[in-house]
C-alpha cells in the first residue's frame, strides 16, 4: 500500500541512560524547537531509569525539506543548552532505529469481511503526541468484544464487523480530530509561540496543556477562547 505522507510520521528513537532533569512522576517531554518545526523532539522516561529519546516529523515535510532525522537528532542534543546539559554524561545503550508511524488524522475503514485492524495497523496513533499504546490497547479490547459477538452469531461479514469501526470512532474520533488540528498549529511558529507564551502566564492553560494527553474533555478546553 502507498503511504499517505501527510497522514504518516517518520520517527527515530534511541535509548539513553544517564539523562538528567527527569521530573518526578516520569512525565513525557515533547520539545518543539524553532529550527525543527513542524517536527518535535521527545524524551520518554522508562521504568529502568533509561529514556526513550527521539525525533518525529510528518513524512511529507521530511521529504519536502530533505530532512536527515539522524543528523537532526544528534544536532538537537548538542545544540540546545537546555538539552545538552542534561545529556552531558548520558550514553546511548543501543543503536538509533527508525519507525514509520501511521497517524489517526484521517478516518479509514478498519474492518471488512473476516478481519478487524487494531493499533498501528488501524492508523490510530495520536497525530499530535505520536502516542499509540493507549489507543492500541483500546482497539484490541474493542475488537475482542466484537469478535466474541461475531463468533456467537457466526457472522463475520464486513457489515457485521462495521460495528467495530463505529465503536472505535465513537470513542476516539473527536480526540484524533482535535489532535490533528493541534498538529497543524505547529506549522505556524508565531501562533504556536503565542500559545506557549500565554501558557507561561496562565496557570489554567499551562495545567490544561500538561494533562491534555490524558483527558479528551480537558484537551477540548484548548479550543475555547476563555483563556
What residues fall within each predicted segment?
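Predominantly flavin-linked oxidoreductase catalytic cores and closely associated redox partners
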Residues: 1-87, 102
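C-terminal helical "tail/cap" subdomain of flavin- and related membrane-associated enzymes
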Residues: 148-227
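Short, charged low-complexity linear motifs
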Residues: 25-30, 146-152
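FAD/FMN-dependent oxidoreductases across multiple families
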Residues: 63-146, 152
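Short capping/connector residues at structural and topological boundaries
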Residues: 6, 21, 35, 41, ...
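Generic structural signal for well-ordered, non-membrane alpha-helical segments
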Residues: 5, 65-73, 108, 114, ...
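Flexible, active-site-adjacent loop/turn segments at secondary-structure boundaries
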Residues: 10, 14, 28-30, 34, ...
Amino acid at each position: 500500500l502507498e503511504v499517505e505522507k501527510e497522514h504518516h510520521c517518520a520517527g527515530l528513537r534511541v535509548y539513553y541512560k544517564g539523562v538528567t532533569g527527569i521530573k518526578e512522576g516520569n512525565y513525557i517531554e515533547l520539545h518543539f524547537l524553532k529550527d525543527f518545526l513542524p517536527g518535535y523532539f521527545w524524551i520518554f522516561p522508562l521504568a529502568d531509569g533509561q529514556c526513550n529519546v527521539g525525533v518525529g516529523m510528518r513524512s511529507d515535510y521530511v521529504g519536502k525539506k530533505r530532512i536527515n532525522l539522524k543528523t537532526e537528532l544528534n544536532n538537537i542534543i548538542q545544540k540546545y543548552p537546555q538539552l545538552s546539559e542534561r545529556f552531558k554524561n548520558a550514553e546511548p545503550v543501543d543503536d538509533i532505529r527508525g519507525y514509520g508511524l501511521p497517524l489517526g488524522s484521517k478516518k479509514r475503514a478498519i474492518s471488512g469481511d473476516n478481519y478487524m485492524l487494531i493499533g498501528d495497523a488501524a492508523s490510530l496513533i495520536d497525530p499530535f503526541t505520536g502516542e499509540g499504546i493507549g489507543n492500541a490497547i483500546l482497539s484490541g479490547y474493542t475488537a475482542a468484544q466484537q469478535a466474541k459477538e461475531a463468533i456467537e452469531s457466526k457472522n463475520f461479514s464486513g457489515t457485521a464487523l462495521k460495528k467495530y469501526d463505529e465503536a472505535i470512532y465513537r470513542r476516539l474520533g473527536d480526540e484524533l480530530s482535535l489532535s490533528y488540528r493541534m498538529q497543524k498549529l505547529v506549522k505556524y511558529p508565531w501562533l504556536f509561540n503565542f500559545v506557549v507564551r500565554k501558557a507561561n502566564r496562565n496557570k489554567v492553560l499551562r495545567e490544561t496543556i500538561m494533562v491534555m494527553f490524558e483527558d479528551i474533555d480537558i484537551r477540548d478546553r484548548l479550543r475555547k477562547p476563555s483563556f
